[in-house]
């Protein structure tokens, strides 16, 4: 080989070596990039990264069915409050949202606090696999794509001490769908003292500790939104911060949202069109009018919930948009609305769209939640006072506000069309008189005859509302008459508010002594108020006590009476109240329920009578049943009418209480020996009482009565009892 050829070969080999080196470098760079990508995909994300991922992979994953295959029907709003005016919520857009977005961004900074991008992508894949054509599908989407991320961000704020205090960021959760706010129910009411021989025999053979776990359904108001934002208070209570409702995406058409919500008299126009049964001949105008009607009805439904649940904040979630709502309690007739349309506001993703992340659904709903935390929900007397004002100033669908001029179409564009005509508006035009409103709230001169929605079966899946708003508002009006005339307004009513119970609960020994006619309990924290004329005896007997409580609540259901926790202390048939009898200072609890559940309270009273000699030790002291003439108002415009009076049993045992199950079995055996099968194994029904150093059992509305067991049978069921002297060391959860 010549020198020339050898040189050429060496040059080729050198080039090949260089190429191999370059390939190796490129391969290493690619592997490094892939490794970094995987690390980025699987590491936790920053606040802004999380917003970007939620919008890109979750919000954009929503796929809607063709409208022809979507659920049909209207939102049921007849008899519900609706506002006179609709105005832009500019304070949220210009002040509140920028402030809270900057706050969250400052607190989170560049810390990697949120789920990895891979997790968000995987969830987005699941979302995109399902077409959304009805409210149930929107429900699932909103939970996964919006509510879950919002809750994750608020959880970070709640753990930030400075922000938690300054901006009132509590522990928070979106409620489950209130129509499904249940534990499973086996369908047994428990109100019958008798049971079949076979069932009774099986229960007696099994004993008190071997029956199947009870499944119970929790009571909910008939006026139920799809969800409630629940905030947990430091003391353990729970209050509502806002109300929300889901709507199928085609019910809140995004192409009409901005124009519809910009109309100050939207509600008046829609109500007038429906009442007059006027249709435009123009098909395009018909579609716009139908879209406006659906939007107005969706807003009305949430507005009514906001009023009756005592909150100033609410929103409509419809997949492609959120309608964020606010009501100023100084102006009930105006609803403020901020339409959130992320697809338009954020736009298509680019390499750097950080400046638009504040417009994502998650970011805006976080700011909405923080805004709502600054406002307290109305409850009890303040709620009734506010609802009396609302009842006097607001109209209900389909009544008209007399002083609003109808800004409708020109006569040439309108035609009077029968509701049987095959047009869009016929779906929500009246054919019949409204049902459920049998008492007028206002004079007939102020109310125009109203067209209403048909009472057929063409309703939304989740819009079934079996309440009778007329009946509830009639009670509200009657309550105001019973209070008598007031020379002032709402502020005066609040200033004259009835005193709430403030004292510690009386002891079991105190209230048992009252019931049995024995001496005062010197260990009761309220004994100084019980003692009259230096006597060691109770100043009243049990019968007089119950009568005095009845008379006190007859004057006002809020005098010395306060609901303990509407969301946390609700059971299968009622709510817990704290009461104080003036001037004797007796402080105890009441189990309140609605008018149609009296039989279950009476059944529970019979169970307590069977357990008479166990009262104050194994079960609370039962002090009778009273009726509240006016009723204690609840969120959702329900009224507690009956109340069973009892001693306070205690608190839920802490997780560290090792012998809780043993103590529970002892108490169950004790009531079983008296012929009572508790029938409800819910953990909340077994409370640690530090005074008696044992587990006390409550809630006997599902209990079954049977003949008491003979002593020999009792001894077989009983186990050796342990000394209770050292049980006071157990901690309770406060």
UniProtKB/Swiss-Prot annotation:
Q: Which gene encodes it?
A: SPOK1
- Compositional bias per record (Polar residues), positions renumbered to this chain: 416-429
* Gene ablation phenotype (knockout): Sensitises spores to SPOK1 encoded poison.
Presence of keyword Phosphoprotein: no
Q: What is this protein called?
A: Meiotic driver SPOK1
Its principal location? cytoplasm
Q: Which residues does UniProt call coiled coil? A: 4-41
Q: Does the keyword NADP apply?
A: no
């Amino acid at each position: 080989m010549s020198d020339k050829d050898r040189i050429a070969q060496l040059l080729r080999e050198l080039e090949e070596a260089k190429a191999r080196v370059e390939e190796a470098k490129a391969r290493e760079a690619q592997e490094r990039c892939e490794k970094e990508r995987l690390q980025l995909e699987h590491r936790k994300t920053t606040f802004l990264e999380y917003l970007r991922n939620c919008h890109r992979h979750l919000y954009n994953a929503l796929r809607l069915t063709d409208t022809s295959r979507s659920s049909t029907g209207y939102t049921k709003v007849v008899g519900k409050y609706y506002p006179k005016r609709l105005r832009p919520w500019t304070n949220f857009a210009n002040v509140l949202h920028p402030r809270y977005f900057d706050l969250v961004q400052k607190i989170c900074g560049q810390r990697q606090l949120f789920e990895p991008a891979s997790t968000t992508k995987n969830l987005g894949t699941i979302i995109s696999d399902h077409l959304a054509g009805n409210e149930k599908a929107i429900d699932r989407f909103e939970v996964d794509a919006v509510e879950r991320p919002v809750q994750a961000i608020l959880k970070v704020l709640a753990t930030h001490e400075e922000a938690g205090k300054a901006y009132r960021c509590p522990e928070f959760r979106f409620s489950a769908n209130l129509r499904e706010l249940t534990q499973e129910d086996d369908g047994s009411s428990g109100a019958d003292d008798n049971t079949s021989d076979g069932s009774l025999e099986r229960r007696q053979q099994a004993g008190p500790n071997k029956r199947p776990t009870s499944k119970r359904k929790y009571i909910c108001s008939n006026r139920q939104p799809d969800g409630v934002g629940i905030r947990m208070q430091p003391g353990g209570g729970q209050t509502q911060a806002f109300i929300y409702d889901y709507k199928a995406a085609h019910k809140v058409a995004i192409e009409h949202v901005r124009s519809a919500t910009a109309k100050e008299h939207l509600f008046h126009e829609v109500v007038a069109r429906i009442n007059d049964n006027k249709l435009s001949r123009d098909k395009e105008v018909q579609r716009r009018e139908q879209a406006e009607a659906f939007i107005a009805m969706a807003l009305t439904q949430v507005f009514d919930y906001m009023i009756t649940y005592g909150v100033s904040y609410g929103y409509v979630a419809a997949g492609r948009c959120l309608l964020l709502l606010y009501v100023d309690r100084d102006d009930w007739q105006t609803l403020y609305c901020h339409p959130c349309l992320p697809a338009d506001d954020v736009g298509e993703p680019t390499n750097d769209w950080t400046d638009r992340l504040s417009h994502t659904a998650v970011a805006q709903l976080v700011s909405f939640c923080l805004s709502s935390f600054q406002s307290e929900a109305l409850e009890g007397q303040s709620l009734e006072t506010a609802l009396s004002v609302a009842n006097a100033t607001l109209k209900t669908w389909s009544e008209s506000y007399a002083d609003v001029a109808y800004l409708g179409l020109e006569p040439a564009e309108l035609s009077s069309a029968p509701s049987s005509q095959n047009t869009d508006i016929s779906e929500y035009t009246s054919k019949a008189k409204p049902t459920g409103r049998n008492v007028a709230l206002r004079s007939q001169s102020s109310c125009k005859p109203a067209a209403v929605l048909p009472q057929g079966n063409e309703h939304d899946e989740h819009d079934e509302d079996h309440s009778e708003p007329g009946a509830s508002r009639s009670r509200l009006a009657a309550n105001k008459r019973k209070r008598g005339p007031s020379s002032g307004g709402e502020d005066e009513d609040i200033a004259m508010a009835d005193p709430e119970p403030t004292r510690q609960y009386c002891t079991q020994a105190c209230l048992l002594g009252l019931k049995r006619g024995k001496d005062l309990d010197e260990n009761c924290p309220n004994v100084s108020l019980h003692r009259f004329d230096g006597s060691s005896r109770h100043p009243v007997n049990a019968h007089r006590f119950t009568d005095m409580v009845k008379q006190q609540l007859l004057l006002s259901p809020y005098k010395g009476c306060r609901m303990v926790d509407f969301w946390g202390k609700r059971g299968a048939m009622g709510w817990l109240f704290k009461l104080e009898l003036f001037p004797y200072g007796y402080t105890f609890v009441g189990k309140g329920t609605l008018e149609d559940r009296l039989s279950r309270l009476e059944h529970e009273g019979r169970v307590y009578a069977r357990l008479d000699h166990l009262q104050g030790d194994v079960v609370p002291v039962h002090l009778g049943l009273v009726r509240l003439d006016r009723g204690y108002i609840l969120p959702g415009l329900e009224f507690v009418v009956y109340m069973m009076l009892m001693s306070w049993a205690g608190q839920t045992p802490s997780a560290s209480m090792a012998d809780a199950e043993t103590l529970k079995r002892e108490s169950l055996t004790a009531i079983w020996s008296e012929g009572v099968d508790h029938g409800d194994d819910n953990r909340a029904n077994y409370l640690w009482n530090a005074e008696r150093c044992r587990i006390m059992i409550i809630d006997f509305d599902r209990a079954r009565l049977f003949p008491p067991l003979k002593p020999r049978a009792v001894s077989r069921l009983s186990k050796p009892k342990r000394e209770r002297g050292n049980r006071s060391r157990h901690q309770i959860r406060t």
